[in-house]
Amino acid sequence: MLFRSRGFGTYLAADDDELADCPVELGAFWSGEFKAGGVPHRLVLAGAAESCDTTRLLADTQKICEAEMRFWHGRPGSASRAGKRPPFKNYLFMLNVVDDGYGGLEHRNSTALIVSRRDLPRLGDGRQTDGYITLLGLVSHEYFHTWNVKRLRPAEFTHFDYGAENYTQLLWFFEGFTSYYDDLLLRRAGLIDDAAYLKLLNKTINQVLQTPGREVQSAAQASFDAWVKYYRQDENTANTTVSYYTKGSLIALCVDLTLRAEGNSSLDDVMRSLWARCKAGPMTEADFAAVLRELGGRAYSRELAAWVHGIRDLPVEELLDKHGVVVLKEPAQLAQRLGIRVTETSAVQIKQVLRGGAAELAGIAANDEWVGVEVAGNGWRLTKLDDLTLYAGDHRKITAVVARDRRLLRLDLTLPAAVTTWRLVVRDPALAQLWLGAAH
């Protein structure tokens, strides 16, 4: 791994897997270093503007790394840390800064990230913007993968076949559980407060609830279909699939809160026990079930069958209430009420129509351009979706005028009376802290 100032020299990979796992980038970078758990880390930025507060970014990245080191290996100097060294001798963050982009790929001792320039922290501006929190969540997610997927990994990935797609039913665990911890560990690292964390969790919950595909595809099926569905999305994806990232994250939440409510253990303990049981290597769902049984004091086969392999909604609201967090139901935004997803530039363009919604019942289709509405004999040009309520007033029955393949269609649309969305609020701060601020 590159830590020298200029990096010139000869590098040798032990095998093809190591070669494929080591990203290489040449150019002029900003570079900063820190230690976490006694291990040297390097942060490299390419494409950042001069306004970027690199000191803050470096310090916050260090806090994330230290929190995740503690999660997996305990605090430095503690008895629980004996013989539990991090599985790498150094680590590299490669941040490629672009005008508009987001994503990352984990490696055994590095990660390659794409971040938007506007999401970077700015000199003289100490605000914790939503964009910066998203960036920190990405850093947290990919760093957590160093343990959970690059070492602890699906048994199907014991040996890689670079000439074919590799399938597993466990992405709900490896991506979903990582997604659960990426934001939670920001909270435990002190980078966000309870309200900010619950806002992020709330977004995940609503994403799942607003995906009709959750009623037809399980998290295990979504994992297996990643190559053919998740990475080949179309206008009907939301109706036929569920994200193993978001659904898996909520499965992790339910497992964690169930274990804590029963007073035996937590998902934190399960993750560390799996690390030890599988010797930081390949694992199966049976390994996960065995550790749950060992730490939880009972078999969780019914829960796993329903949550992982079933399609019913998860008991999120009930479990949150047991941990001092309540769900408030609030009116949803207009697009959600109608069951559509749109883009608005010069017109209202329909991107997706969700199964069972008012728009589908009216006959609105993906790729339609919603050009106008007729209400009580009056016609109105529609350029922004939110203007619909202005024109409709108290009327629930209107006519939607859409352009489809250059033809104008008049479709009878009934506006739904009420559709709600969730908002999470702490009811019992002391009880919530046992989960949100947990050290175990």
For each feature predicted by the language model, list its residue ranges.
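Active-site metal-coordination segments of metallo-dependent hydrolases
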Residues: 167-175, 242-244
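C-terminal recognition in membrane/secretory proteostasis and scaffolding
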Residues: 182-183, 192-440
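An active-site-proximal "capping" alpha-helix that borders the catalytic cofactor pocket
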Residues: 68, 173-185
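Surface-exposed helix-capping loop/turn segments at secondary-structure junctions
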Residues: 70-88, 153-155, 188-194, 260-264, ...
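Edge strands and adjacent loops of beta-rich recognition modules
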Residues: 13-36
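Juxtacatalytic substrate-recognition/specificity segment
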Residues: 33-171
